[in-house]
């Protein structure tokens, strides 16, 4: 969806709002100039009947980038959902659902090449193609608070229960968050580039805990229930970069009053001036 807002008689500000379509969206620049890129990561997931579980909200990132006419950039907007399916831009290979558990929120990323979701840029030779990322929030099972995504370091998950795995920690700039282990459960993955970590119970295959939020580096999960960490954001590919965690005030992507974290699917807003 795009729309134009008049600024004065000589210039107008054009904005493109990109929502979650679970696919890569291409934007081709209509003019040469400076473009403002804003991204909101998605909230983490929870199980529908877990009324005391609070997944982490998604973070916010913004910056500017000078682009030529007819340049193409590619947007992956993160997904959230309250059940156990894997979520777009935070989908580990070979898994379609976290049965018994829940997924972390998907990151929202903008890149200069179309390689697919953020995880496919993990090779260092591809990471320079990433312009900006907003981290997704950590998932939560039973009760507690999933870690907010966003910022240079995502927030850790929090729960007061002693009968679950330790909470997952937030993703950082060069390493993913740590997935909380528990006796009898397997840590399948700690957080890593583009993906939140997770674990499961091996003698009941498919009984998962909560997954960390996606991000530049994903948050750690919790192998048995519990609260996962949020994914980190990234702004080194843009000028004037700024990022906020999902527990902080940030602009509303739909143009309303400021919000405290993004509590739904992710968004991307691209804006530029036309002479």
Label for each model-derived stretch:
Residues 1, 12-22:
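Boundary/junction segments of secreted and surface-exposed precursor proteins
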Residues 16-17, 25-26, 50-52, 62-65:
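Beta-strand-rich interaction surfaces with strong enrichment in secreted/lumenal proteins
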Residues 29-36, 68-72:
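Extended extracellular/luminal ectodomain segments enriched in beta-structured repeat modules
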Residues 46-56:
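Short, surface-exposed beta-strand/strand-loop-strand elements in extracellular ectodomains
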Residues 55-168:
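Secretome/extracellular-domain signature
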Residues 95-122, 145-153, 175, 192-235:
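Catalytic nucleophile loop of clan PA
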């Amino acid at each position: 969806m795009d729309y134009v807002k008049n600024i004065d008689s000589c210039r107008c500000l054009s904005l493109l709002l990109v929502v979650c379509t679970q696919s890569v969206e291409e934007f081709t620049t209509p003019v040469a100039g400076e473009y403002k890129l804003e991204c909101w990561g998605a909230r983490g997931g929870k199980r529908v009947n877990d009324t005391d579980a609070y997944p982490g909200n998604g973070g916010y990132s913004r910056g500017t980038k000078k682009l030529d006419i007819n340049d193409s950039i590619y947007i992956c907007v993160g997904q959230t959902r309250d059940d156990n399916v894997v979520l777009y831009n935070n989908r580990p290979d070979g898994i379609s659902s976290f049965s018994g558990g829940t997924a972390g929120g998907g990151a929202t990323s903008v890149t200069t090449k179309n390689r697919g979701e953020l995880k496919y840029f993990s090779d260092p030779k591809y990471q320079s193609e990433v312009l900006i990322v907003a981290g997704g929030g950590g998932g939560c099972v039973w009760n507690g608070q999933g870690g907010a995504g966003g910022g240079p370091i995502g927030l850790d998950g929090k729960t007061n229960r002693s009968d679950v795995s330790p909470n997952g920690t937030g993703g950082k700039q060069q390493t993913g968050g740590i997935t909380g282990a528990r006796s009898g459960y397997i840590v399948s993955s700690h957080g890593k580039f583009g993906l939140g970590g997770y674990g499961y119970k091996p003698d009941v295959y498919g009984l998962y805990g909560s997954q960390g939020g996606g991000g530049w580096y994903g948050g750690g999960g919790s192998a048995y229930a519990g609260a996962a960490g949020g994914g980190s954001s990234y702004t080194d590919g843009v000028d004037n970069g700024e990022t906020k965690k999902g527990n902080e005030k940030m602009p509303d992507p739909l143009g309303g009053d400021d919000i405290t974290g993004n509590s739904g699917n992710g968004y991307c807003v691209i804006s530029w001036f036309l002479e």
